[in-house]
Amino acid sequence: MFTRVRFVFLGVALLCSLSVFAQTLSGVVTDQKSREGLISATVQLIAGDGKINYTSTDLKGMFQFKKLPAGTYTLQISYVGYKTYKEAVVIPSSGEKKVNVTMREDVNLLDEVSVNARATRAEQKGDSLLYNAEAFKVMQGSSAEDLLAKMPGIVVEGGSIQAQGEEVKKVLVDGKEFFDGDVNLAIKNLPSDIIAGIEVFDKKSEQAEFTGFDDGEEVKTINIVTKGGFRQGTFGEVSAGYGTEDRYKVNGNVNFFNEDRRISLLGMSNNVNQQNFSQEDLAGVISSGASGKRRGGGRNGGRGGAFGGNASDFMVGSTGGVTSSNGLGINYVDQWGEKWKVTGSYFFNQSDNLTQQQTEREYFDSSLPGMTYSEYQESSMKNWNHRFNVKLDYQISNRTSLQFRPTLSFQNNDSHGLLQGLNLLNGMSDNETETATLGENDAYNVGADLILRHRFLKEGRTLSLMLSGKMSNTDGNTYTDYLNTLYSADGLSETDSYSQWKQTLNRQYTLRSNLSYTERLTDYMQLQLGYKLSYTDSENDRKTYKKSAVSDLYDQLDESLSNEYQSGYLTQAGSVGLRYRAGKFNAMLGVDAQWADLRGDMVYPQADNLSHRYFSILPSFTMRYSLDRTNSLQLRYRSKSSAPSVTSLQNVIDNSNPLFLSAGNPDLDQQLSHTANLRYLRTTKSGHTFIAMVGATIQQDYVADSTFVAKEDMELTPSVTLSKGAQFTRPVNMDGYYSLQSMLTYGFPIDFIRSNINLSLSANYANVPTIFDGIESKTRELNLIPKIIIGSNISNNLDFTASYSAGINKMFSSLDTATGSDYVTHTASAKLGWTFFWGLTFRSTFDYIGYTGLDTGTEDYFLWNLSLGKKFLKNNAAEIRVEAFDVLKQNQAFTHSIGSNYYDYINSNVLKPYAMISFVYTIR
């Protein structure tokens, strides 16, 4: 009896002691004026013995500390641009302690240049890196893009943004989507003076954010954290200008923010190559073939051609040449009651582009001795695009939620193209082609994602289901007139002319699902079990008709250039994952056992089918270790499979350029890729920021180009002849592809000139396998890019930035050992903005681009733009500016690239010099 009583007392004592260490402190941090939650605020809980617990607030401003012993603590909360909050809190021996904190803006902090300001230049908060916008001063009236360009580890160049060595795919505003995350719409239209901080992180998918397990779908994301005073009110900017050469530009953006409800209106129209949005232009991507773009045909990395890119990546930047753009959009964010959250946007844009491009190609002597290629291309392209996006979140209960995200877009593309290509052998004409093309494409994309999420009563146990469906359709018509000339050794020539109509219909359906179950195993470990299914069905129907000399109609079907092909790719995977999280260490290990079925069916001109089945083990691993508040290390590894596109599988000849024919390959296999990267971050209280990143990618069964050159005229089909000197390319699977990437960035302030300096060095290496004339080769490219940026941090009235980078390019092929493959790209820039007495403003941008080490000698140009303005009205809300573009009249667009057996030198048309007077009004 005594023994039993003793055990009872021991058990009660043990339970009591455990309860002492099982208390929870939670709360919400909000802005005093707007009452909105502050995202990524730093929360410290300091015990009586000095031990400090850290966390940060989530997207709702909430925080939580678990398993705390009872006692008295000091709660300290800091946030960029706000006064630090400090309070003594008592954790009871039982129950949960809740604290609601409101924070006030620190108006004095915004004008201080001190050690304290430097201390918040950049901070690590969990998996995020948060920059203090007040530590990077830009001129009043600047955009978010100007602010980002001054921050270490962020590169703004060529209409895209890179952060920590990766391209930024999404931009949020206070954790909320802004025009479906369109990068350019956010950074080019939002003013810099509303920004309190910039948060850089890898955004996981909605399902992964819920479960805590990565699914490989994370994208580099920037979250623009606005100042509390701008979360309720109206702000924006409108401007209009007209100048010489009939140049004009009109821009406007107005934002109505009222706590949870946010409405943004955008509009723009100009003919000066300004495109303040990303263009979702599937029709433009697919129609690029109408203007002469082709596999192996000549402008890899070229600037200013037709729309480039992958047809699965609809968001593309502005084109080369000269572009007129019009756009109009609305973004809506709101919370309907306590259960509904809605985000929606509509955007329309129209663009008209004229590109004139000259390409000069030199082949390696070992592959095509004495052979050169010259091409002139002119294309006129008009695009219309409508896109709708909605995101609905419904909180069914406190443990169950539903998210529905439908999308819809329409595109139309009209193009006119002229292409003149000439092959020369030892300086003498060998063969040439001239094509005139008229094309029209219509496309639509519709899709929807549905996510059901449930948290069970047991902590760590969740169940979630994701369902996704997408459908795309493109209908195109292309009319082409051909004139081909073949020269003989004795100087005689033979010409052939014909016309054809190409009708294409491309459809694709994609269905995906992901069922995930998580279970807490211990206080530090969680298990995930999942099942994934994905199916993509693609169809490409291409019919080519010749023009009859008798009827003058396109009524003669060319079977050798016609094909109907269907492909299907089904993957099923069972997945298991383990997540371990204890203090500063967080790791996740996962593995997918995937079964895949790749099917190809040729329907026309004759029936044929192929089927490939695969089994793959696809592991993944993520590890993050926070050495302390200022140092962190992250390691990530991913593996995945991908199927070849239907156009790569379709064995039909593309004769857009008769000198460079191409066709698909139905025998292609799926690709497997393995990607790993290691990243180290260090931020100090003295304002120093250091980022180091190294990564590698290996691809198995890489889809490479296999090209051969006709030594004599070759008949490929009864109606298609590969003329002497012309090339034929088709895709093949090859092993041996790998790439290496690395980046170092070091940023620090210099007080005596009140500026920030960012030093960076990136190094990239790629090994690309190819086949040329039956010989396997490797094309290797090494790029080293050192860069220095000096940005002022004086005041909003004086802003300057100076930068220089040297792109050291060493490219060589196993087909050629000749010199001339090394060149250096020099890029320098100086930017000055100054508001001086009587509200006068002066702005100047000076850019230099030069190439050295080329066979053509040194090529370079300067681009200098100036403006002088006068601010007036209350708070200097209005400004009149006189602007001059290309003062030195040197603007050019040229670039250089390398292929498996050639070098390209490319020049494009550019915007000519003009002067403009404009009016700008700031809404506050």
Show the residue positions of the predicted features:
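Conserved C-terminal beta-signal and adjacent last beta-strands/turns
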Residues: 787-808, 820-924
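Signature of Gram-negative outer-membrane beta-barrel scaffolds
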Residues: 526-630, 818-820
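Membrane-proximal, glycine/serine-rich, low-complexity loop/turn segments characteristic
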Residues: 62, 66, 76, 83, ...
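Outer-membrane beta-barrel translocator domains and adjoining extracellular loop/strand segments
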Residues: 211-212, 277-282, 355-371, 415-429, ...
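Transmembrane beta-strand segments that form the barrel wall of outer-membrane beta-barrel proteins
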Residues: 233-243, 265-267, 594-595, 664, ...
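Periplasm-facing N-terminal accessory domains of Gram-negative outer-membrane beta-barrel systems
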Residues: 21-114, 122-124, 150, 155, ...
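Outer membrane beta-barrel strand-and-loop segments of large Gram-negative receptors
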Residues: 376, 510-512, 556-563, 669, ...
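Extracellular loop and loop/strand-boundary signature of outer-membrane beta-barrel proteins
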Residues: 239, 315-318, 371-378, 430-438, ...
